[in-house]
């Protein structure tokens, strides 16, 4: 049985394409059942996020299974296959396993190390389990992916460094103030950077967030999203004394906060420190503000330096994570191979043993005056011969480094000797520890 992956991501398709094939999380039953109803597809999990849509499936027919899933994606979403296909990737065997382990470990994410993707895959697996589209192989496969992701998080520092300007700003604020839960943040601007910063500040425990923007409606919208307080831009100078941390990212062509403003602001704050983060280009805050006592100003260049350093560190940690993924691939394939190899070996030995015993019985029954103990010796002899004959094929089957050749060997033996192989059981899953 083969694991296959068919999908697209931010690396292969623009958002205009990704949104065409996205699956609604609350409506997963229908597409999951449709995939497992495809010929030769036995199990399926659908992962659909803002950055990727992927289908994980099991099949004996790799090429056919991939083609059917591609056609399903096109037909289900009413998108021409010729348009979709140039954005799709497909993997099977070890490549499929490596891909999913890397995705779960956030090695394939837009921001390497981000934690959201693991939770999204767990949610997707939950739907597959609920609607019974996953079975023994994908159940084990996804649990192994979760285990790999946990190892990566535990054994590397891949998620510990800021790799976006907005996140770097929050990390810098933490270094300056320590605990941020009792601090008030003022966001000047309502664009993507301010939105990201709002998310990060709230994630680290900030409860007081204010938002101002030249267009008040945009400030209101962002404030509503994060349970913050919208402020009219005209009230900026009256609002500044209430803020401990000010992050500014507007499109203004000139400074909106000047050195001369700070004397009155600090007096009203009783000279408590203020932390300014100016990530606008051109800059929003007069650089001379940094010369004012108790005012600390950082620009986008300061933060980019932090990000660049952390990106280099994250590359080192990513290499460690890739090594963990490679280790775990071997363990998973050892278990996967055993699902079909072990029953086949048992069936092969049973088949040969039945022939041996039948021929031994015929020989013994027609042998008059058989010496005492001879039957026992003949039984041992024929059993030894059988073991010698089966040793080499059994050893080859038990090897775990053969990739898809094991499937060929298993199918060949089953067909050549007309073997009756028992079904795969849940007990096999216990052969591989987390």
Swiss-Prot record:
Pathway: Porphyrin-containing compound metabolism; protoporphyrin-IX biosynthesis; 5-aminolevulinate from L-glutamyl-tRNA(Glu): step 1/2
Catalysed reactions, semicolon-separated: (S)-4-amino-5-oxopentanoate + tRNA(Glu) + NADP(+) = L-glutamyl-tRNA(Glu) + NADPH + H(+)
Superkingdom of the source species: Bacteria
Enzyme Commission number: 1.2.1.70
Gene3D superfamilies listed in its UniProt record: Glutamyl-tRNA reductase, N-terminal domain (3.30.460.30), NAD(P)-binding Rossmann-like Domain (3.40.50.720)
Residues engaged in binding substrate: 49-52, 109, 114-116, 120
Active-site residue list: 50 (nucleophile)
Record site feature (Important for activity), residues: 99
Residues binding NADP(+): 189-194
Alphabetically ordered keywords of this record: NADP, Oxidoreductase, Porphyrin biosynthesis
Function statement: Catalyzes the NADPH-dependent reduction of glutamyl-tRNA(Glu) to glutamate 1-semialdehyde (GSA).
Other information: During catalysis, the active site Cys acts as a nucleophile attacking the alpha-carbonyl group of tRNA-bound glutamate with the formation of a thioester intermediate between enzyme and glutamate, and the concomitant release of tRNA(Glu). The thioester intermediate is finally reduced by direct hydride transfer from NADPH, to form the product GSA.
Family: Belongs to the glutamyl-tRNA reductase family.
Record note on quaternary structure: Homodimer.
Domain notes: Possesses an unusual extended V-shaped dimeric structure with each monomer consisting of three distinct domains arranged along a curved 'spinal' alpha-helix. The N-terminal catalytic domain specifically recognizes the glutamate moiety of the substrate. The second domain is the NADPH-binding domain, and the third C-terminal domain is responsible for dimerization.
Protein name, UniProt field: Glutamyl-tRNA reductase
Record organism: Geobacter sp. (strain M21)
Lineage: Bacteria, Pseudomonadati, Thermodesulfobacteriota, Desulfuromonadia, Geobacterales
